[in-house]
Amino acid sequence: MVNVIDYMPGDTLLHRLNPVVKLGLAAAIIVGIFLSDTYVALLGFLALTLALGAYAGVVDRLFSLLKLLIPLALIMLVLQLAFMRDGNVVWGFITDTGLITGSKACLRLLGVALPLILMLMVTKLNDLANACVEVLHVPYRYAFTFTTALRFVPVFGQEMNAIMEAQTARGVEYDTKNPIKKLKLMLPLCVPLLISSVGKTDATALAAEQRGFYLRTCASSYKRYPIKGLDIAVLIVSIALIAIGFLF
């Protein structure tokens, strides 16, 4: 099973950007979404993210993530409609203010979740960690912790699937449509998953220590990450995106 944040090789301009600039572009889109207050701007930022994903060849993964987020966005919309009492009543307990606020919150949720995932799809985690150390002067231990946590996401997913398959072979039915019953079935799986995660974390820490983890500096990487003309142009575009979010 392909994880949604796995690196997708490619030779597009998005792939060739400095990893720090990719993070800056993703952050600019997210900030612009939070600053925006119109449907045009929110939909525009969402469309921009999907267009970048299509250009990089990862739009299918973005749509799969979008499908997972839509139910959560709908729940947020229902909560906004239920508890927002300001404005004029449109129908029943629904007010125009609640409808507008809830729909914008849904668009923000969908728009904020995609940019960072997109940048992770087109960036190797080793390059991301080393670029943060070299360009941003982030201590290597923090960059390593962040990228290692991302690497563990698919590992834990595979562990959970293996545990569920073992329990299914014993007659446990996880395909129930009752969410409360499914939650009760899933909670006991957290214990073996936690034990497995602690073991993997301890093994990773020992391996890193034996390889001289604490001796590593920004000069330890053989690969350099200079800021080129294309990177500067993208940074200027990122600033413009924040300005657009502020104005609209």
Question: Model-found features: residue ranges?
Answer:
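Transmembrane alpha-helix interface motif
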Residues: 1-41, 45-48, 162-248
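Buried hydrophobic packing residues in well-ordered domains
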Residues: 18, 62-63, 119, 153, ...
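Structural signal for the C-terminal ends of transmembrane alpha-helices
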Residues: 35, 51-59, 122-123, 246-247
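Membrane-helix interface segments
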Residues: 39, 58-59, 138-142
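Hydrophobic transmembrane alpha-helix segments characteristic of membrane transport
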Residues: 46-52, 127-131
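Alpha-helical transmembrane segments and their membrane-interface exit regions
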Residues: 48-58, 72-78
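Interfacial helix-loop-helix linkers and transmembrane-helix boundary segments
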Residues: 58-67
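Juxtamembrane/interface alpha-helical elements of multi-pass membrane proteins
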Residues: 69-173, 180
